[in-house]
């Protein structure tokens, strides 16, 4: 109890120095909490923007389809797979798709692109296509409806209600087939790849165009917990009868995002290292100045029989209080900033990752329990570790030299 009282009194013998040191350490902790929240928010933003734009959190395809998108590699009878998906309580939604490269033509121009056949009701649960409609209406289920990107619409010189001819190869005969559609909606994802190269029609119309009645190329999955779909899910559905099925999580679909996530973790480690340097410099400077101011005091208590261990304990308790006070202040400031930007967001402007625009241009920080518990403990522990050397220095003060120096 005596050590605690002495350490607390010694801490405020020079209030200005103590407050400056607290300001340094608490600022470092506040920055660490805010930066960690921003990094977590960036991770969520990147994953959400990629998976909710069009790709989905996971996909089921015929083995080899994703290598070159060969239209002949399709799932002829998805009934068994759909039965398994219906029973899976982890899923929140899924959507069936047909994909094919083809020609997209108007009365004025033509261009190559990707034709997507989708189920409108299912698709709105797994992608942002409905939310991306800038003109007109989303697909309602009528066979001749078509959605086109803004850039492609400008290239073909078409508008709402105009006719579009789609040309694609039949999956069985490889003969070219054509069908006529009308533009019901124009979408804008913000990514040139999507707005210039994709069109969407109803699933049944695409199946008819390609001659694959009942067949599909892709099933897009959405999970209640996105962590479920991080890696490949083959083991989860290994009892499927069709062994030619490939199930891929979002990390397999977008390896570049995985690499970016590793860099964000590295960023947190770098910030933690910088914080360690700041704390070390601040604590060592503060404690050494405090020790030199009390050189006579240490000489006296050593002369009356105080052990080295007791002096070490006194300095470490003082450092603990310094770390505790700094951690409390840094925690309050860091949480206030993180909470504010978790509501209002940090404006990013137009930022693109893997060809996909990140959300609505705002980064929202993410709060987590470990930021409240472990990061302040990390700061207190660093303060104690840094104080070990000054504590040992104080314990080795020779009483006679200390008294002579004081005189």
Predicted segments with their positions:
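Transmembrane alpha-helical interface segments in multi-pass membrane proteins
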Residues: 288, 297-342, 382
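C-terminal membrane-exit region of the final transmembrane helix in multipass inner-membrane proteins
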Residues: 367-407
């Amino acid at each position: 109890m005596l050590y605690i009282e002495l350490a607390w009194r010694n801490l405020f013998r020079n209030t200005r120095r103590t407050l400056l040191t607290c300001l340094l350490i608490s600022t470092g902790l506040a920055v660490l909490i805010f930066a960690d929240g921003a990094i977590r928010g960036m991770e969520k933003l990147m994953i959400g923007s990629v998976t909710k734009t069009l790709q989905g959190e996971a996909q089921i395809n015929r083995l080899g389809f994703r290598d070159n998108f060969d239209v002949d590699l399709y799932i002829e009878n998805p009934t068994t797979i759909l039965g398994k998906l219906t029973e899976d309580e982890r899923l929140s939604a899924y959507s069936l798709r047909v994909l094919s490269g083809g020609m997209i033509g108007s009365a004025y121009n033509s261009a190559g692109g990707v034709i997507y056949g989708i189920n409108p009701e299912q698709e709105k649960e797994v992608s942002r296509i409905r939310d991306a409609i800038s003109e007109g209406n989303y697909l309602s289920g009528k066979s001749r409806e078509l959605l086109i990107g803004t850039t492609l619409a400008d290239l073909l010189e078409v508008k709402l209600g105009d006719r579009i001819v789609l040309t694609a190869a039949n999956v069985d005969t490889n003969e070219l087939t054509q069908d006529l559609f009308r533009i019901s909606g124009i979408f804008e994802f913000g990514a040139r790849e999507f707005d210039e190269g994709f069109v969407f029609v109803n699933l049944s119309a695409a199946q008819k165009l390609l001659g694959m009645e009942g067949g599909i190329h892709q099933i897009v999955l959405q999970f209640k917990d996105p962590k479920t779909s991080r890696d490949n899910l083959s083991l989860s559905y290994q009892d499927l009868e069709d062994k030619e099925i490939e199930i891929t999580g979002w990390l397999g679909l977008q390896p570049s995002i995985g690499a970016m996530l590793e860099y964000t973790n590295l960023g947190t480690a770098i910030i933690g290292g910088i914080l360690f340097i700041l704390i070390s410099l601040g604590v060592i400077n503060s404690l050494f100045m405090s020790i030199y101011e009390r050189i006579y005091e240490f000489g006296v208590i050593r002369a009356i029989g105080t052990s080295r261990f007791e002096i070490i304990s006194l300095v470490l308790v003082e450092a603990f209080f310094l770390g505790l006070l700094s951690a409390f202040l840094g925690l309050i400031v860091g949480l206030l900033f993180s909470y504010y930007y978790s509501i209002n967001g940090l404006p990013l402007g137009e930022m693109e990752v893997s060809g996909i625009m990140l959300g609505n241009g705002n980064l929202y920080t993410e709060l987590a329990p470990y930021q409240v518990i472990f990061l302040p403990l990390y700061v207190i522990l660093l303060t104690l570790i840094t104080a070990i050397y000054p504590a040992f220095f104080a314990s080795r003060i020779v009483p006679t030299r200390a008294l002579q120096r004081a005189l």
